[in-house]
Curated annotation (Swiss-Prot):
Keyword Cell cycle included in the entry's annotation: no
Keywords, in A-Z order: Membrane, Phosphoprotein, Transmembrane, Transmembrane helix
Keyword Transmembrane helix: yes
Membrane topology, from the record: Multi-pass membrane protein
Entry's induction text: Induced by alpha-pheromone. Repressed by the ALPHA2-MCM1 repressor.
Top-level taxon of the source organism: Eukaryota
Compartments where located: Endomembrane system
Name of the protein in question: Protein ASG7
Gene behind the chain: ASG7
Chief location of this protein within or outside the cell: membrane
Naturally occurring in which organism (per UniProt): Saccharomyces cerevisiae (strain ATCC 204508 / S288c)
Topological domains, Cytoplasmic: 71-184
Length: 209
């Protein structure tokens, strides 16, 4: 019986719909597609390393500053959104999966948007809030018996999904620029301190003569 149960559980995991796992469009993280962000992503992990190397060789601080200027200002850095294909939008299958699973985790901003739209359509949704790994998450519960027009409801979910995508893109763009700014301000501060120390040493040498 134990072997049979484990076999059934194993098959069940393989039969699980993609929406219920990692391909859930509500869980996917969308990033800015501007040229600046695309070029900055592979460079980002090197910023703290170059800062540490700069303590021994200040040239690395200059490299950080040049990369900051070239990637964050010289390159086009206007927000660009992910080109969503039709099959990437939550459809009827995803909507049914939501109602069957009762709850799905979504961002607080998206939950607020859906709540406002549902108030306009006189539908009564119940919101559940749970915590995962110590971080609060928002959950949406939709009762299909209270929805009269499926097409209208699907449009509302898609609109909320677009709001979520826009939020993700803006957040990723701002976070990447903030990371570059923080590390390069540290590099600039290191160069200033080194310059002051060099000037101080030169003045001391002149006085000693």
């Amino acid at each position: 019986m134990t072997t049979l149960a484990s076999s059934i559980e194993h098959k069940t995991k393989h039969l699980a719909a993609p929406f219920e796992n990692d391909e859930n469009p509500w869980m996917k993280k969308y990033c800015c597609q501007c040229k600046s962000c695309k070029m900055s992503v592979p460079v980002q992990p090197w910023l703290p390393r170059f800062f540490v190397f700069g303590i021994l060789c200040p040239v690395f601080w200059l490299v950080n500053l040049l990369a900051w200027w070239f990637l964050q200002y010289w390159q086009p850095h206007e927000l660009e959104f992910h080109d969503l294909q039709e099959d990437e939008y939550p459809g009827f299958y995803e909507y049914e999966a939501i109602t069957k699973r009762t709850v799905i985790p979504i961002k607080e901003e998206v939950l607020q948007e859906i709540r406002v739209m549902q108030n306009f359509s006189d539908s009564n949704s119940e919101e559940y809030y749970e915590s995962k790994d110590g971080m609060p998450s928002s959950f949406l519960n939709v009762n299909t018996e209270q929805v009269e027009d499926e097409n209208d409801t699907l449009k509302k979910y898609r609109y909320a999904f677009l709001k979520k995508v826009a939020h993700d893109v803006l957040e990723s763009h701002d976070l990447l620029r903030k990371t570059f700014r923080d590390w390069n301000l540290r590099s600039l501060l290191g160069l200033l301190i080194d310059s002051i120390l060099i000037i101080f040493v030169v003045l001391l040498c002149k006085k000693s003569r």
